[in-house]
Amino acid sequence: MPTFRRGDVVKVPFPYTDRATRQSRPALVVSTARLEEAHALLWVLMITSADNRGWPGDVDISNLAAAGLPIASVVRTAKIATIESADATKLGKISAKALKQVSREIGRLVELE
């Protein structure tokens, strides 16, 4: 049985392409339960402070308390990683409206829409 669902906000060791280290940070689960059930993996998008310079495709997180986030944050749809589900800790979840917007932005990036 999967532990995580699309739309969950998790804390994970997010990898960086420009460093050999990983930093523990919030991320959004965008994969379906099938990936976790078959391979114990999650596809996640970076969540970053809304104070950082915005990127095209960023999605605001409106309900910080429900997402388990302490400060204004955005989902950075251009930054995706594959994480072992055992390394993730659930913090909360984003709204259905925000998840739909994230899905639309991902679709644009991979030309599904």
Regions found by a protein language model. Name each.
Residues 1-3, 20-21:
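An N-terminal domain-cap segment
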Residues 2, 64-113:
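C-terminal terminal-subdomain/extension
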Residues 20-24, 29-63:
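Compact nucleic-acid interaction/catalytic patches
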Residues 15-19:
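Short, charged beta-turn/beta-strand-edge "cap" motif at the junction between a beta-strand
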